[in-house]
């Protein structure tokens, strides 16, 4: 089996739970066809660089996949049919990177920097 990284962009008007459900559908589809998803990352609702099908934002997800080519082809076929999916891209990689992706690592780092500020700097409103 080969290793793949797969990014899916779903429409902005679906809920985060529906985007997560889409990821679970992809996981079930790949496992039915002899594949395995090693990692699923939901990147959240992000701005698109340009409008796609009248959408300015999209729910991004990254999947690290270990599956045969036929399973990946079937997954892509199902994504083409799904109306909630704006775009997707699958690339073949030499090995799966199971660490946190740079997108999530940066977001966690930024959240960590914000929370380090001491709380006693705030003066009460007079």
From Swiss-Prot:
For this protein, the record's InterPro entries field holds: Ribosomal_bS6, Ribosomal_bS6_sf, Ribosomal_S6_plastid/chlpt, Transl_elong_EF1B/ribsomal_bS6
* Identification of the protein by name: Small ribosomal subunit protein bS6
- Mention one GO molecular function: structural constituent of ribosome
Any idea what job this protein has?
Binds together with bS18 to 16S ribosomal RNA.
UniProt GO cellular component terms: cytosolic small ribosomal subunit
Q: Which UniProt keywords apply?
A: Ribonucleoprotein, Ribosomal protein, RNA-binding, rRNA-binding
Presence of the UniProt keyword RNA-binding in the record: yes
Q: From the UniProt entry, list the residue stretches annotated as the region Disordered.
A: 107-126
The answer on whether this UniProt entry bears the keyword Magnesium reads: no
For this chain's UniProt record, which GO biological process terms are given?
translation
Organism, scientific name: Caulobacter sp. (strain K31)
Q: Which family does it belong to?
A: Belongs to the bacterial ribosomal protein bS6 family.
Under the heading Pfam families, the entry gives: Ribosomal_S6
Return the NCBIfam families for the record: S6
């Amino acid at each position: 089996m080969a290793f793949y990284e797969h990014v899916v962009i779903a429409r902005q008007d679906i809920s985060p739970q529906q985007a997560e459900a889409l990821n679970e559908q992809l996981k079930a589809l790949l496992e039915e066809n002899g594949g395995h998803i090693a990692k699923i990352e939901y990147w959240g609702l992000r701005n698109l660089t340009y409008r796609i099908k009248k959408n300015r934002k999209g729910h991004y997800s990254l999947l690290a996949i270990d599956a045969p080519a036929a399973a990946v082809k079937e997954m892509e076929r199902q994504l083409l049919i799904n109306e909630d999916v704006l775009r997707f891209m699958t690339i073949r990689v030499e090995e799966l990177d199971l660490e946190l992706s740079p997108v999530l690592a940066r977001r966690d780092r930024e959240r960590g920097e914000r929370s380090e500020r001491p709380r006693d700097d705030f003066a009460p409103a007079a």
